[in-house]
Amino acid sequence: MLDVCICTHNPNRQLFEIILQALANQTLSKDRYQVWVIDNASDRPIEIADLAILSAAGINFKLLLAPKLGLMYAREVAISATSGEWIIFVDDDNELTPNYLATALELAENNPKLGCFGGKLLLPKDTRHANWVKAMLPYLAIKDMGDTVLSNCVNYWGEWEPPGAGCVLKREVLEVFQRRIATLSPQFVLGRQGKSLLSAEDSMITRGAYELGLECAYQPRLELIHHLKPQRFTFRYLLRLLYGYGRSYVLLERILGNPVAAIEGRSMITFIMRKITFRIKDTQSIQQCLCMVAWDLGYLHESRQIQES
């Protein structure tokens, strides 16, 4: 049995119907999966009537409320409510291809060393964005590493580590995550929370696999369409996003008990100019360069919090 969990906050209702219809169109027998919709403090609450597509398809589903705003809190509600061996997290803008769940279950059952895995996350074919944005797509959870399986069991990030969108996770891995967040102080809360663009919660979840001696994997047979809002391709949004990534990296390393090098004795202007000089060598556009410098500034901000604490 698969537990398919959709954590949502103020979803686009038209797109949400597409996401639900994709679940209704799955080739996997309806008695092999259950859908859980977790409403995370939406201004207009999700109602049972909004899930009529699932009901009409004969899918077993439940609607849960997560009143405390934050993706981490919504996922914790989902984990606590479910009981299956495998959980799939589906974002409210993830359109699963028809064989997604059947393939996920097959891979889970035939690969006992897997702790978590995901696949290709593709943009709709009619998506338009500036050319420079292409290099930034991985930071927007757009991923296509080709058709070769990638897997590993090492305690650091690599292309085998799946984003949270469409991620398939063994319950034991999520139990490690639950134990970890139970001891976290508010300053270490990762994941989206309102307008906050902190991230790395996905990495915190998947690192639990390594602690159990299980692998993370990229499985290219899995595909979903990631419907992103046009604003996410803007320079302003990507600057904010990468700044959040830089902060999140420091927070994640501290949560995992790893040392973080503090940056000392430099003025902000000196720091920025040195980083631009360094980044410009490895980037394809000035916009990409400045976005990566925003990552560095996020790292600087959070690492200095260590010095001041």
Q: In which residue ranges do the predicted regions lie?
A:
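Conserved donor NDP-sugar-binding/catalytic core segment of glycosyltransferases
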Residues: 99-133
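Non-catalytic, C-terminal membrane-associated alpha-helical segments of glycosyltransferases
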Residues: 240-244, 257-309
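N-proximal low-complexity "stem/linker" segments adjacent to membrane-targeting elements
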Residues: 1-25
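Acidic donor-binding loop at a coil-to-helix junction in glycosyltransferase catalytic cores
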Residues: 184-205
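Short aromatic/hydrophobic "clamp" motif used to bind/position activated sugar donors
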Residues: 87
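Glycine-rich, basic loop-to-helix element that forms the pyrophosphate-binding segment
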Residues: 66-82
